């Protein structure tokens, strides 16, 4: 039976620095690939930062060339990678908050945030969710931040057969106790493990708490990161259940990624 290896990439990005944030994502991806990670989850809007007031200017189309090096590394490593960005949608005046899944076969699929925080509707359009992912026999349901504030969202994921509820979030220190209890409760209530990837630094005026975490199907916290900063939380499941480890600070200790040859964005299948 295959052993699933999942990870949360808790990254301290720079708002609006797309080139620098892509480089940081690549660094996380290479380290995760070295550790055998099969699914790597980044936080909400990880590529741009959480900047609602300029989201329209930062919004990217589905076939953006920005994803090309990330797609290439995901494909080379055979690692499903989920990154966050504001998605420009034809026919909509406002972008959607998207979690883009880069598949090992080169394809890209998108999950769009269904439930918006109060005030986000000024800058974003609500999305329609997305399909379950499958990693080593585990069905993975995606969630973006305020989605998990709606109990119906997690209940629907469990009803669809999800084994793991993967939440890309931005949670500050004041809200962390409340929000972590909600996620733990979903794990316990639905018998569905929960992986949470939080930002590791300030973004959009919010001081992120970090403390990315994983709860097993009984609601037990298997592993979490300590505070903010660049951290990689790696989780695996063996015969004795889930186990995890937190790895700190990708730079300067982590080597620069050796990039694979990048194909044209137009040559990558998008669905």
Where do the PLM segments sit?
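Short polar catalytic/cofactor-binding loops
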Residues: 10-15
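Extreme N-terminal starter segment of soluble prokaryotic enzymes
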Residues: 1-8
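C-terminal beta-strand edge segments of enzyme domains
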Residues: 132-134, 199-271
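Short hydrophobic-aromatic micro-motifs
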Residues: 40, 139-144, 165-167
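Active-site catalytic loop in hydrolytic enzyme cores
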Residues: 90-160, 173-175, 179-181, 238-255
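Cys-nucleophile CN-hydrolase/nitrilase-fold catalytic domain and related Cys-dependent amidase chemistry
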Residues: 18, 22-104, 173-192
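Conserved hydrophobic/aromatic positions in well-ordered beta-strands
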Residues: 7, 100-102, 109, 213, ...
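CN hydrolase (nitrilase-like) catalytic-core segments centered on the catalytic cysteine
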Residues: 63-82, 149-232
């Amino acid at each position: 039976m295959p052993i699933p290896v999942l990870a949360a990439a808790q990254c301290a990005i720079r708002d609006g620095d797309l080139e620098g944030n892509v480089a940081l994502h690549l660094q996380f991806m290479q380290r995760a690939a070295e550790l055998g990670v099969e699914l790597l989850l980044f936080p909400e809007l990880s590529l741009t930062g959480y900047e609602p007031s300029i989201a329209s200017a930062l919004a990217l189309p589905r076939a953006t060339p920005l994803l090309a090096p990330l797609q290439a590394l995901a494909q080379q490593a055979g690692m499903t990678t989920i990154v966050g960005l504001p998605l420009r949608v034809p026919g909509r005046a406002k972008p959607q908050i998207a979690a883009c899944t880069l598949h090992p076969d080169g394809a890209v699929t998108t999950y769009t945030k269904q439930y918006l925080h109060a005030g986000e509707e000024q800058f974003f359009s609500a999305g329609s969710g997305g399909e379950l992912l499958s990693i080593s026999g585990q069905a993975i349901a995606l969630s973006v931040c305020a989605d998990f504030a709606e109990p119906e969202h997690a209940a629907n994921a469990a009803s669809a057969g999800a084994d793991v509820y993967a939440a890309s979030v931005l949670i500050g220190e004041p809200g962390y106790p409340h929000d972590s209890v909600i996620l733990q409760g979903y794990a316990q209530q639905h018998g569905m493990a929960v992986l949470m990837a939080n930002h590791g630094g300030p973004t959009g005026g919010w001081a992120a708490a970090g403390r990315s975490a994983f709860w097993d199907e009984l609601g037990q916290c298997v592993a979490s990161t300590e505070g903010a900063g660049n951290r990689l939380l790696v989780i695996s499941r063996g015969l004795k259940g889930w186990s995890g480890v937190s790895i700190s600070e990708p730079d300067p200790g982590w080597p620069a990624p050796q990039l694979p040859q990048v194909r044209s964005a137009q040559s990558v299948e998008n669905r």
